[in-house]
């Protein structure tokens, strides 16, 4: 419901309009956006009321009703006030026969970016000129805000891309020949981030000359890459060493699993989870988990995250921001309330960035739904990680009865035992 508010008459009716009002439209800009498209190529929904669109009007996908309403309101200078909660359009279903709240309808026209300067008819009333100037100010402020959001999002993406390039070098490499990494998680956290496997400190010469399974070698590198990445988190220096241990034990497997899924999907264009050498995860002879659970069942368990990525076609940027969100998990058991608040504040910044990115690429109407579908992958990622840890515990009960390739007291064991 909305009421029409009579325009205020200003004493200075001779006040000159803004330069935007006087500026004529260049000849090259006379064509509307939809006229430049291929024949019959129209948007599906009106950005204002969500009914069927008939094309682009004032640079926005719109129906004939919203196009006419916006034009008439600007020319007449009418002002409408919503008598509800200013969210009437959010609460209605798409229905062309339903009467829309005029206050919310005009506000949505401005929000989605209808260009008032594209109205070809002259604004002749004083009220219309004042309304147009007000709309122009709002749109200018909105552009400034959008620019600030773009700068924030660009910075986030740039930082994550640089970090991803660094940790991928470590993730897809192996420990130098003749050495193994026997450091505990606590010891690893004492050093600055190291992304080159040849620079890893305190490596241990190999005492057992028996060859280790290549899957275990890459598993260690993948976990180590996730741990090294976590050292770059802004909150890392703000929480205690014990809190870091608790958090990283929980999230490092999540981070490494997501990196492996992204590698297979984005780099190798594969629908199967691959090791860096191209081997399919879980199909290597001699792998105890594969032998105990069965190769097919074990492979299916390992590929749940990849299948979730493929199902909704997660792009590279969405993956990086989503991983940043999930590795900053304030709800990990054992963290103090202060630690949770510190981690949550940083996590919210990345959640905001992901929402802005989805809106930027999928629009105001579809962006939030895309954001929700990405966040909905979280339970799948958590479940896969938990199942992997459960399988590890089961494998440990059998390892005493046969030779096992898992090095004792290593980072891998410490993470999987948590």
UniProtKB/Swiss-Prot annotation:
Superkingdom of origin organism: Eukaryota
One cellular-component annotation, GO: nucleus
Main subcellular location: nucleus
NR C4-type zinc-finger residues: 46-66, 82-104
Regulation: induction: Transcription up-regulated in response to intestinal colonization by probiotic Lactobacillus fermentum strain JDFM216.
Any Pfam family matching the protein: Hormone_recep
DNA-binding region: 43-121
Region (AF-2): 403-414
Keywords from the named record: DNA-binding, Metal-binding, Nucleus, Receptor, Transcription, Transcription regulation, Zinc, Zinc-finger
InterPro entries: HNF4-like_DBD, NHR-like_dom_sf, Nucl_hrmn_rcpt_lig-bd, Nuclear_hormone_rcpt_NR2, Nuclear_hrmn_rcpt, Znf_hrmn_rcpt, Znf_NHR/GATA
Listed PROSITE patterns: NR_LBD, NUCLEAR_REC_DBD_1, NUCLEAR_REC_DBD_2
Biological processes annotated in GO: cell differentiation; regulation of transcription by RNA polymerase II
Record-level Gene Ontology MF annotations: nuclear receptor activity; RNA polymerase II cis-regulatory region sequence-specific DNA binding; zinc ion binding
Coiled-coil residue spans: none
Ranges for domain NR LBD: 174-414
Subcellular location: Nucleus
Family of the protein in this entry: Belongs to the nuclear hormone receptor family.
Function: Transcriptional regulator. Plays a role in modulation of lifespan and immunity.
Descriptive protein name: Nuclear hormone receptor family member nhr-209
Gene name of the encoded protein: nhr-209
């Amino acid at each position: 419901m909305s009421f029409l508010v009579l325009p205020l008459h200003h004493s200075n009716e001779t006040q000159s309009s803004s330069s935007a009002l006087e500026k004529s439209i260049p000849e090259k800009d006379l064509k509307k956006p939809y006229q430049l498209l291929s024949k019959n190529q129209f948007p599906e929904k009106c950005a204002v009321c969500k009914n069927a669109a008939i094309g682009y009007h004032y640079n926005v996908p719109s129906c004939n009703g919203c196009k006419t309403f916006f034009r008439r309101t600007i020319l007449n200078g009418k002002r409408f006030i919503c008598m509800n909660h200013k969210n009437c359009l959010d609460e209605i279903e798409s229905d062309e026969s339903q009467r829309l709240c005029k206050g919310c309808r005009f506000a949505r026209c401005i929000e989605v970016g209808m260009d008032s300067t594209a109205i070809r008819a002259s604004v002749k009333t004083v009220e219309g000129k004042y309304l147009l100037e007000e709309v122009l100010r709002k749109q200018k402020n909105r552009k400034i805000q959008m620019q600030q959001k773009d700068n924030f999002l660009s910075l986030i993406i740039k930082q994550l891309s640089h970090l991803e390039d660094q940790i991928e070098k470590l993730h897809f490499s192996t420990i130098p020949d003749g050495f193994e990494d026997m450091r505990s998680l606590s010891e690893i956290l004492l050093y600055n981030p190291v992304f080159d496997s040849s620079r890893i400190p305190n490596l241990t010469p190999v005492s057992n000359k028996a060859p280790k399974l290549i899957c275990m070698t890459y598993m260690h590198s993948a976990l180590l890459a996730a741990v090294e990445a976590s050292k770059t988190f802004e909150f890392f220096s703000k929480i205690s060493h014990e809190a870091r241990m608790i958090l990283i034990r929980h999230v490092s497997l999540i981070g490494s699993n997501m990196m492996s899924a992204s590698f297979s999907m984005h780099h190798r264009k594969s629908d199967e989870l691959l090791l860096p050498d191209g081997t399919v995860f879980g199909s290597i002879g001699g792998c105890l988990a594969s032998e105990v659970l069965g190769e097919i069942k074990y492979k299916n368990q390992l590929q749940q995250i990849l299948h979730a990525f493929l199902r909704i076609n997660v792009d590279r940027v969405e993956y990086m921001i989503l991983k940043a969100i999930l590795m900053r998990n304030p709800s990990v058991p054992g963290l103090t309330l202060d630690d949770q608040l510190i981690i949550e504040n940083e996590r919210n910044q990345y959640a905001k960035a992901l929402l802005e990115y989805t809106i930027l690429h999928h629009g105001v109407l579809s962006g939030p739904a895309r954001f929700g579908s990405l966040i909905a992958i979280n339970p799948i990622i958590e479940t896969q990680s938990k199942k992997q840890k459960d399988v590890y515990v089961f494998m440990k009960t059998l390892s005493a009865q046969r030779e096992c390739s898992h090095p004792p007291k290593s980072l891998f064991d410490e993470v999987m035992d948590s």
